[in-house]
């Protein structure tokens, strides 16, 4: 049976400042930790990325032509405050006013994120969100933006608090590149959630117009053998690290007893302790019912198997299928069922996981209000032929995920939109320029844009709301 989506559904495309803009030192932009980290550790940098800093009128015109009626944009904190605090950079402010005006001119609603992996270097090198002073700096930056950019109707505090802690302190593929420090992972999650809560409360107390929420990456975790209690436990612990700890903070305003039991077990095995304060929980509690929406970024699921041994994680950044490894002491290891398809980067393709995650939010956090799927898409080594890309695999991937969103809506969940990652090809943080996601192919040499086959397909779905 052909499935449909509501008439008022947002069919969006997603971007992020650092992955798309380029112009990393232009017009007074301050440095971010990624600038030097990429130079020192990777085979690429964020120059020129997709040159969105200059080419945004082209991308927004294409968006309008191809039925894309929403765009995720992030503000680069260091374009507004080059050192994260203190002096404002007027050229950065002017750029975003111009960008938002162009969005509205093209009838593409901007959903604006304040922080997408790019803390200004001055604050990042001072402990990033492990340093509680940076909570204050973030809230001040948020307040400036709420006041200044009154043309924005949809605000998101953070993009993917989970993968920030994970990338910076567990896998170690994000600056500062620390590995296997679970206490830092949870402390980063917690302090960022307090920052989120305080910004949301300020937004509501000040009576700003528009809506505010947060974007969480929520990869669904399953036991490898659902009949084995040890595998079930491994999946539960892995879910706490990546999903439940953060969701509890967002919607319960505290961590449930079951969540804290899991956290304490993980820290007993791996070492370290957390600094969780009374005033933190007061802030979390005050904001728990104020989120207007939850953004869910979903790409994949994982299967977990019980495991007794030391932590070892190998990140597959070059698309060499089968080269990744993930096992955490006291938690478990990832082991995929043989019959589930994977990308070249070992990301498991499992649309059912998105449905299950959406239904979990509805069941466990009934105060969620509404959901946007704020990222979903297929990273691929696209072949550019005849000025396009025949990306049937991407079409199939997006189609199947839109279908389960339709199912979730039928089953009573309030899902209001979908943003494909990514609008145009951008650079991928730890995978470079080879891993493409866009509806529009970018020739990174010339910065020309070419609609892929998926763009024509997406346009038809957006126009008809029929998934076929």
From Swiss-Prot:
<dbReference type="GO" id="GO:0005829">
    <property type="term" value="C:cytosol"/>
</dbReference>
<feature type="binding site">
    <location>
        <position position="297"/>
    </location>
    <ligand>
        <name>D-galactose 6-phosphate</name>
    </ligand>
</feature>
<feature type="binding site">
    <location>
        <position position="429"/>
    </location>
    <ligand>
        <name>D-galactose 6-phosphate</name>
    </ligand>
</feature>
<protein>
    <recommendedName>
        <fullName>6-phospho-beta-galactosidase</fullName>
        <ecNumber>3.2.1.85</ecNumber>
    </recommendedName>
</protein>
<dbReference type="GO" id="GO:0008422">
    <property type="term" value="F:beta-glucosidase activity"/>
</dbReference>
<dbReference type="Pfam" id="PF00232">
    <property type="entry name" value="Glyco_hydro_1"/>
</dbReference>
<dbReference type="GO" id="GO:0033920">
    <property type="term" value="F:6-phospho-beta-galactosidase activity"/>
</dbReference>
<feature type="binding site">
    <location>
        <position position="437"/>
    </location>
    <ligand>
        <name>D-galactose 6-phosphate</name>
    </ligand>
</feature>
<comment type="pathway">
    <text>Carbohydrate metabolism; lactose degradation; D-galactose 6-phosphate and beta-D-glucose from lactose 6-phosphate: step 1/1.</text>
</comment>
<keyword id="KW-0326">Glycosidase</keyword>
<feature type="binding site">
    <location>
        <position position="160"/>
    </location>
    <ligand>
        <name>D-galactose 6-phosphate</name>
    </ligand>
</feature>
<feature type="active site" description="Nucleophile">
    <location>
        <position position="375"/>
    </location>
</feature>
<dbReference type="GO" id="GO:0019512">
    <property type="term" value="P:lactose catabolic process via tagatose-6-phosphate"/>
</dbReference>
<feature type="binding site">
    <location>
        <position position="428"/>
    </location>
    <ligand>
        <name>D-galactose 6-phosphate</name>
    </ligand>
</feature>
<keyword id="KW-0378">Hydrolase</keyword>
<dbReference type="InterPro" id="IPR018120">
    <property type="entry name" value="Glyco_hydro_1_AS"/>
</dbReference>
<dbReference type="InterPro" id="IPR033132">
    <property type="entry name" value="Glyco_hydro_1_N_CS"/>
</dbReference>
<comment type="similarity">
    <text>Belongs to the glycosyl hydrolase 1 family.</text>
</comment>
<dbReference type="InterPro" id="IPR017853">
    <property type="entry name" value="Glycoside_hydrolase_SF"/>
</dbReference>
<dbReference type="InterPro" id="IPR005928">
    <property type="entry name" value="6P-beta-galactosidase"/>
</dbReference>
<feature type="binding site">
    <location>
        <position position="19"/>
    </location>
    <ligand>
        <name>D-galactose 6-phosphate</name>
    </ligand>
</feature>
<feature type="active site" description="Proton donor">
    <location>
        <position position="160"/>
    </location>
</feature>
<feature type="binding site">
    <location>
        <position position="159"/>
    </location>
    <ligand>
        <name>D-galactose 6-phosphate</name>
    </ligand>
</feature>
<feature type="binding site">
    <location>
        <position position="435"/>
    </location>
    <ligand>
        <name>D-galactose 6-phosphate</name>
    </ligand>
</feature>
<dbReference type="InterPro" id="IPR001360">
    <property type="entry name" value="Glyco_hydro_1"/>
</dbReference>
<feature type="binding site">
    <location>
        <position position="116"/>
    </location>
    <ligand>
        <name>D-galactose 6-phosphate</name>
    </ligand>
</feature>
């Amino acid at each position: 049976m052909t499935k449909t989506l509501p008439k008022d559904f947002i069919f969006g495309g997603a971007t992020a400042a650092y992955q798309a803009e380029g112009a990393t030192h232009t017009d007074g932009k301050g440095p971010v930790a990624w600038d030097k980290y990429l130079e020192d550790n990777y085979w690429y940098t964020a120059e020129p990325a997709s040159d969105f800093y200059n080419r945004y009128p082209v991308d927004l015109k294409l968006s309008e032509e191809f039925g894309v009626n929403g765009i995720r944009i992030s503000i680069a904190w260091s374009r507004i405050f080059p050192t994260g605090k203190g002096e404002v950079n007027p050229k950065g402010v002017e750029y975003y006013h111009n960008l938002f005006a162009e969005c509205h001119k093209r009838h593409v609603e901007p959903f604006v994120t304040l922080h997408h992996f790019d803390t200004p270097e001055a604050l990042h090198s001072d402990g990033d969100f492990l340093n509680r002073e940076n909570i204050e700096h973030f809230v001040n930056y948020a307040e400036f933006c709420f006041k200044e950019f009154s043309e924005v109707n949809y605000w998101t505090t953070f993009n993917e608090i989970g993968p920030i802690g994970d990338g910076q302190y567990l896998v170690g593929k994000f600056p500062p590149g620390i590995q296997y420090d679970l206490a830092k992972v949870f402390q980063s999650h917690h302090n960022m959630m307090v920052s989120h809560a305080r910004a949301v409360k300020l937004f509501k107390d000040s009576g700003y117009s528009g809506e505010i929420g947060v974007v969480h990456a929520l990869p669904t975790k399953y036991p490898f053998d659902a009949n084995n209690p040890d595998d079930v436990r491994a999946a539960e612990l892995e879910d706490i690290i990546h999903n439940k700890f953060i969701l509890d903070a967002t919607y319960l305003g505290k961590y449930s007893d079951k969540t804290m039991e899991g956290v304490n077990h993980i820290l007993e095995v791996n070492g370290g302790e957390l600094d969780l304060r009374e005033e933190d929980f007061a802030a979390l509690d005050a904001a728990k019912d104020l989120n207007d929406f939850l953004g869910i970024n979903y790409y994949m699921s994982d299967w977990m198997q019980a495991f007794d041994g030391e932590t070892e994680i190998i990140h597959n950044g070059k698309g060499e299928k089968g080269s990744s490894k993930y096992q955490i002491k006291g938690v478990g290891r990832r082991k995929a069922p043989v019959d589930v398809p994977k990308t070249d980067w070992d990301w498991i393709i499992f649309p059912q996981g998105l449905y299950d995650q959406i239904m979990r939010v509805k069941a466990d956090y009934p105060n969620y209000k509404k959901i946007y799927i704020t990222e979903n898409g297929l990273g691929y080594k696209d072949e550019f032929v005849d000025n396009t890309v025949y990306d049937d695999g991407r079409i199939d991937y997006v189609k199947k995920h839109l279908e389960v969103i339709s199912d979730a809506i039928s089953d009573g969940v309030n899902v209001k939109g979908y943003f494909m990652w990514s609008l145009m090809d951008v650079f991928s943080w730890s995978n470079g320029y080879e891993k493409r996601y866009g509806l529009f192919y970018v020739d990174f040499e010339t910065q020309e844009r070419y609609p892929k086959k998926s763009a024509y397909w997406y346009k038809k779905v957006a126009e008809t709301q029929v998934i076929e």
